[in-house]
């Protein structure tokens, strides 16, 4: 069969046809398809010629399979060599789409740049040819599609996962830059995932040779959400623009959307040029620092690839050697090789099922008894672990007002997915809002001997009715007035059990949420579920509800607040929640102060006799309040002031 007119050029075509057969792709080896399967493929030309691709020069045929993806110029299909059974991804470009010289030059440029690249994290170029209808580029098949597919299924990835993928992208990108090639279109859809969960950089349709600064291309190209400001300003495209795009990729994987994405393209471009974006508080400090370093307006200010790899985000964070296939659709179990975590798992195994066979029943009972005793010792001293004693008479201790809180370092914080992270903006926002409201209330409050009239029918309030501090081993457990039980674990994760005890809610960070039926909790989370259940049982059996506020049915609270941070002083417990609620429990007389609502601010006071009243903060500001309540408001203000970063 004679070649069709209009082949790309003699040189690239001859190189593809020089060998008697194209190299085997990464798909099934020749032995993968045998006997009847190969006979079936061999019989297809007469029965379904539209599904066959034939190389005009060699006569080799390929069975065109499922559609893998499509772009502006081409569609990509899975293709199988009918003789060897080798599988490829074939990029099919209609001749009608490259009729103009500059369009054809673009395809030729892609082939010239890609064909000689050989790197573990670059999609392998196999061969190419064309016929009268199409141009065919045969590439390494990445059976798990692209990072875009994973992102669409998961929305956000854990930081160890992001490190895993970014290391491979950086490795491939460094190779390209060392060979003087700019990718110019780094985005999730151009990072392909193999059967073994290895990442490959692909799609070199916009790639270009690196030129001296004065000769660099000034055209605007790339995907809008990932384009660097210097490209939009037509200042030329250098390696730094690829680094910028990498920063946008990192942000998208961690946060769920690109940093500069808006509903309007012009507004997106304006944000990019002005580098206007926000860093969520849920990110770890190293992640925020690295993103801030990469997403800088001036290309000269951005870190190099080597500097990125030396950043704390990579050097101090855990990176798995390999990700499970299940991570394409669901959050994986990523347990770093940490001796403390191993000990934690060992302890929880011994306490909650999977007991060692060598232990007799008496030993097992002793272990559980020891846990109960430990819980009692750590909580009873400052907690309602027994029937309440008669309330003491007289005003609250003067020390509540005049003595600075002691031992008030944060004891637990809902953090990002790792250790050693700085306090997030979410906690800071709650603290600053409460500080501002309390200062405004107390500063103008007139003297008074009694409280104003409380609200007759306040909105139902979700508050902490019971709590257990077992942070010396596991974390801080609490029960809400809705009967939902939760634990803020020492590693910064949060798990809750619904009021009907049928649903488990897991938050690896304050912004990432997963829910499971009790019977479908992943195995990796079973130890935490065991601890949560034990806390629930303990609080149910040993602790009294801390006040007479009306109960709230959980069905009426679709998004119960998460405990962000808890702090213990020598006189009180401070709890900060994701909905802005602030609760202070005073040990000595079991009074409680709850700030909630914010628009308007509500102040709920649970007195010594367990009665609860809710007031508008504006009424307290205008009319004053009793000395008891005023002293507790001032102490709460002092606690919050110590939490404020200002």
UniProtKB/Swiss-Prot annotation:
Signal peptide: none annotated. Induction: Cytokine and cellular adhesion trigger induction. Down-regulated in a majority of lung carcinoma samples. Residues 62-314 form the Protein kinase domain. Serine/threonine-protein kinase involved in cell cycle regulation, response to stress and Golgi disassembly. Polo-like kinases act by binding and phosphorylating proteins that are already phosphorylated on a specific motif recognized by the POLO box domains. Phosphorylates ATF2, BCL2L1, CDC25A, CDC25C, CHEK2, HIF1A, JUN, p53/TP53, p73/TP73, PTEN, TOP2A and VRK1. Involved in cell cycle regulation: required for entry into S phase and cytokinesis. Phosphorylates BCL2L1, leading to regulate the G2 checkpoint and progression to cytokinesis during mitosis. InterPro entries: Kinase-like_dom_sf, PLK3_STKc, POLO_box_1, POLO_box_2, POLO_box_dom, POLO_box_dom_sf, Prot_kinase_dom, Protein_kinase_ATP_BS. Phosphorylated in an ATM-dependent manner following DNA damage. Phosphorylated as cells enter mitosis and dephosphorylated as cells exit mitosis. Its main location: cytoplasm. ATP binds at residues 68-76, 91. Transcripts are highly detected in placenta, lung, followed by skeletal muscle, heart, pancreas, ovaries and kidney and weakly detected in liver and brain. May have a short half-live. In cells of hematopoietic origin, strongly and exclusively detected in terminally differentiated macrophages. Transcript expression appears to be down-regulated in primary lung tumor. Changing residue 219 to E: Kinase-defective mutant. It comes from Homo sapiens. This is Serine/threonine-protein kinase PLK3. It is found in: Cytoplasm; Nucleus; Nucleus, Nucleolus; Golgi apparatus. Residues 1-35, 381-417 are annotated as: Disordered.
